[in-house]
């Protein structure tokens, strides 16, 4: 498998843009990431290029997937458990009181014990003219040669390329005709537009025609641009993918370049019970494909539903970590087609880097009256239901959430010690999101938000020593330097308070936008196993060994 990972990494290398361990008997538990994005590679790449990223490039699911957060053991006696914890504190940037319930799914399953089935893998590659840049197509050839050599005998690989039109180079046949596939790899050339619709449809047709329940049936789509040829309507592309995914074929998407259609690629993956990745470096490629092949295709549970009902004294606010939450102010929930064991098992970046840590679901809570520091007692009830692969039996679990916060409590008050890392991750995300929002109208206010966030993160990490938070602070420094280069002067005093409090700040001659904040080139995020209701690939984390 290691050689296979290297082969796929080589295949895709040029599509890129330039606490202590604790023991737990009987296995551990962890968080779940809701949604398709598994990194914030585009956000990071824009910063590396000297730009100012827009809010849409900071995907909550991707951000959480790059943070390992400890969770309690999976001790409910089932393969899947729900854990609900709460924090009451103050926003790291604005200082407002806030209460949040964080939901995790945990499992005793060890990622090292997960074995993948043989592959029915259809690779759909963009060979448009832009693939000539930096000899990307040359590296694709080299990678294909390596991949062909390293696939296991039981695997099947089909190859489709698309530019203005579509070419089917090989089907899903067994045994693999390695000689013919090597000849095909030598012939790949780049030219023309980007006909994603026809290329993806042909990939699905091949996968559907050879569908086998004893195999992993998946299409892997790579593109470095937005649709420019054939049917370019995003709704049509998404609708076509939904039809094929309903037949049980998964879809993973890989986005490359700063100007690709992140929302379309992410939406396709989410509709396909798959992941969306952005490749910003050769290292990222190795991380992505190691995780995708080894962990992201064998579901632990199907038809997973998480529901939250607020106590009459509380109501639900913003939900961060899934785009598919349905509900009102008193109750809500999310349905997930499948959940998978995550690959990362500690806060140290491992074989797959910072990806693969899973994710989190945060539900903002507010008391009907008063402030969250005084609303003690019951807060919400949480219900989990799911079924195991190959079974129709529905397994259920219920847990209750309560607050014991008080005005004398330290900031933050945590319902469990294991909530600390989650709360810091949540606070960092909110702070970075606030900075991207401020940058839309004032670079100086964005800089002020980042300065405040960094001070809070520094204070927090003096005790926590979380390497993921250190990595976030490096992003803050890069973001801050880019703002300074674009004219953001030092901010302080009343002006800073006005910015952080959401006032009118300081737009005008002191703000230099140039090309403005970089955002997605289009819109939408979206997956299904067999069922397409609410689509999200979910990873389950384990406790540190």
Predicted regions mapped to residue ranges:
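Sec-dependent signal peptide recognition
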Residues: 2-10, 527-532
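C-terminal motif of bacterial Sec signal peptides marking the signal peptidase cleavage site
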Residues: 13-16, 519
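Von Willebrand factor
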Residues: 17-150, 158, 167-169, 173-215, 258-261, ...
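Acidic, polar loop-rich interaction surfaces within structured domains
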Residues: 78, 212, 235-247, 256-389
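DG-centered beta-turn motif at the end of beta-strands
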Residues: 125-128, 140, 159-162, 203, ...
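Juxtamembrane/start-of-transmembrane alpha-helix segments at the extracytoplasmic/lumenal side
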Residues: 518-530
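A cross-kingdom C-terminal cell-surface attachment/processing module
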Residues: 528-543
């Amino acid at each position: 498998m290691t050689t296979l990972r290297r082969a796929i990494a080589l295949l895709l290398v040029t599509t890129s843009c330039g606490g202590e361990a604790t023991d737990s008997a009987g296995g551990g538990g962890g968080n779940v990431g809701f949604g398709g994005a598994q990194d914030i590679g585009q956000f990071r790449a824009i910063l590396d290029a000297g730009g100012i990223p827009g809010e849409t490039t900071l995907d909550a699911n991707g951000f959480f997937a790059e943070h390992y957060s400890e969770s309690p053991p999976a001790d409910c006696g089932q393969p899947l458990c729900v854990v609900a914890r709460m924090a009451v504190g103050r926003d790291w940037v604005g200082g407002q009181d806030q209460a949040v319930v964080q939901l995790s799914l945990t499992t005793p399953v060890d990622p090292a014990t997960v074995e993948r089935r043989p592959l029915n893998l259809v690779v759909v590659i963009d060979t448009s003219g832009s693939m000539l840049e930096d000899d990307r197509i040359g590296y694709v050839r080299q990678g294909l040669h390596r991949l062909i050599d390293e696939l296991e005998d039981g695997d099947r690989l089909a190859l489709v390329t698309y530019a203005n039109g579509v070419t089917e180079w090989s089907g899903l046949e067994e045994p693999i005709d390695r000689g013919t596939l090597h000849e095909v790899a030598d012939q790949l050339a780049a030219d023309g537009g980007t006909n994603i619709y026809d290329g993806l449809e042909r990939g699905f047709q091949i996968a559907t025609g050879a569908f086998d329940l004893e195999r992993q049936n998946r299409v892997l789509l790579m593109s470095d641009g937005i649709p420019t040829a054939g049917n370019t309507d995003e709704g049509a592309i998404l609708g076509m993918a939904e039809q094929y995914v309903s037949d049980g074929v998964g879809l993973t998407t890989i986005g490359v370049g700063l100007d690709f259609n992140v929302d379309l690629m992410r939406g396709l993956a989410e509709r396909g019970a798959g992941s969306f990745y952005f490749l910003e470096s050769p290292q990222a490629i190795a991380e992505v494909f190691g995780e995708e092949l080894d962990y992201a295709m064998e579901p632990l549970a199907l038809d997973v539903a998480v529901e939250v009902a607020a106590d009459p004294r509380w109501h639900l606010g913003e939900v961060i970590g899934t785009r598919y939450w349905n509900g009102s102010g008193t109750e809500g929930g999310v349905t997930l087609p499948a959940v998978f064991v995550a690959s990362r098992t500690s806060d140290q970046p491992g074989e797959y880097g910072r990806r693969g840590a899973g994710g989190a679901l945060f539900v903002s809570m507010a008391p009907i009256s008063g402030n969250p520091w005084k609303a003690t007692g019951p807060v919400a009830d949480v219900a989990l239901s799911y079924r195991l692969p190959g079974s129709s039996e529905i397994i259920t679990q219920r847990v209750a959430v309560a607050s014991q916060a008080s005005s004398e409590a330290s900031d933050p008050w945590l319902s469990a010690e294991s909530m600390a890392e989650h709360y810091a991750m949540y606070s960092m995300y909110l702070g970075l999101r606030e900075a991207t929002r401020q940058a839309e109208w004032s670079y100086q206010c964005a800089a002020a938000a980042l300065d405040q966030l960094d001070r809070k993160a520094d204070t927090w990490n003096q005790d926590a020593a979380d390497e993921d938070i250190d990595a976030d602070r490096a992003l803050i420094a890069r973001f801050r330097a880019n703002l300074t280069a674009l004219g953001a002067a030092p901010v302080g005093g009343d002006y800073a308070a006005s910015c952080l409090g959401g006032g009118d700040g300081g737009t005008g001659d002191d703000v230099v936008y140039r090309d403005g904040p970089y955002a997605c080139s289009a819109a939408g995020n979206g997956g299904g196993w067999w069922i397409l209701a609410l689509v999200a690939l979910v990873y389950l984390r384990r406790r540190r060994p």
